[in-house]
A protein has these predicted regions:
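Alpha-helical membrane-protein topology signature
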Residues: 16-218
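N-terminal amphipathic/basic-hydrophobic helices that include classical n-h-c signal peptides
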Residues: 1-20
Length: 218
């Protein structure tokens, strides 16, 4: 009797390999999302306790950008796995931003430079929404995220005790885990994820500055 495709051991093995290949990126997305939630919980907890003082410009923009992109993604029926991670990437900063208003000890005074960086980030977000080229849109999204990061980087560098380290450790690991899940390696697919990995890596250096023996402040 001739075996069909489902009875062919070689075909079964190929199907199994294809299934494993297809689910591996999903596993990375799940782990990455859980890391973000864990780090976000620790930061939110410390914010409510007054131990951590979020820079509201950074955290507002970190919440805004993913949620804006999520709205656009839903309008074109984007992949649900990627959308879940984007949703968490917007909700976690949003919750932290709101949490900073519940304890006066969590307040961090904003400077004109913070507002300037926020303005640049918002401008990049605006042009990102208007961009017709996917490549330009991704680069603008990366620029918006970088401009939003600068105020918190300076604060963390000068006053690392006002930050919760775990969120940056987890965010860095989360960004690294997503790299192998990139389906096609080109600038459009990888630029934003690489910028996230580099940004969180820089933040790790900032929050561990004193532990690394770096005394110079900005």
């Amino acid at each position: 009797m001739r075996l069909g495709n489902h009875g062919d051991p070689a075909q079964v093995l190929r199907d199994w390999k294809m299934t494993a290949y297809m689910t591996f990126p999903h596993s990375l997305v799940i782990i990455s999302t859980l890391l973000m939630l864990w780090g976000g919980y620790a930061y939110f907890r410390d914010t409510l306790a007054g131990r951590t003082k979020p820079n509201r410009v950074s955290w507002f923009l970190w919440a805004l950008a993913p949620l804006v992109s999520l709205g656009a993604a839903f309008s074109v029926d984007a992949d649900i796995w990627a959308s879940v991670r984007v949703l968490v990437g917007g909700v976690v900063p949003g919750v932290i931003f709101l949490g900073s208003f519940f304890n006066r000890k969590s307040y961090w005074k904003l400077t004109r430079f913070d507002w300037f960086c926020g303005g640049l980030s918002l401008t990049a977000l605006l042009f990102w929404q208007l961009a017709s080229s996917p490549l330009i849109a991704v680069l603008l999204a990366a620029a918006a995220n970088t401009f939003a990061l600068i105020p918190t980087f300076i604060k963390a560098w000068n006053f690392p005790e006002t930050e919760t380290r775990l969120i940056y450790i987890n965010s860095f690991l989360s960004a690294v885990l997503i790299i192998p899940a990139i389906p096609v390696w080109n600038i459009a697919n990888s630029a934003f994820q690489i910028s996230l990995m580099l940004g969180t890596g820089v933040m790790l250096v900032a929050v561990y500055r004193k532990s690394l023996g770096i005394k110079k402040t900005i």
